[in-house]
Amino acid sequence: MKPLENTIPALNTAAICERLKQVRIQVCGTRGQSHFAALLHLSPSTYNYYEKGRIPPVDVLDRAARVTGVPLLWLIRGEPTDFSLESLKKIDVPAGSDAGMVSANGTAGV
């Protein structure tokens, strides 16, 4: 029997970060990075690290999946391959809100 580590394919960090970015652009638009970070309960700078190549923890990926409706396995592995970003609902990003906190239901925080 082969050791377990030889049977599990390595994660592609760059691909995970790129899929997370694609989801953010699809649901919040190109200027919605801070808004999307707030939806994930992250600071904009922490979220930016994830888009720039630092692998997000599983709880962040899970939150992104729950908030957007993206399959978690798609974020991690790109499966199922028939998943389409176009099926995601857009989240309205209030004008000038790219620095404010927003709750998961899309309402502005206080």
Predicted regions and their residues:
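DNA major-groove recognition helix of helix-turn-helix
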Residues: 51, 68, 76-79
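The alpha-helix within a helix-turn-helix
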Residues: 24, 37, 65
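A short, Lys/Arg-rich alpha-helix, primarily the initiator
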Residues: 1-29
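Interfacial/linker helices and their anchor residues that mediate assembly or domain coupling
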Residues: 83-110
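DNA-binding alpha-helical recognition surfaces that contact promoter or target DNA
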Residues: 18, 22, 38, 49, ...
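Short alpha-helical DNA-recognition segment
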Residues: 27-49
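DNA major-groove recognition helix of helix-turn-helix/homeodomain DNA-binding modules
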Residues: 59-74
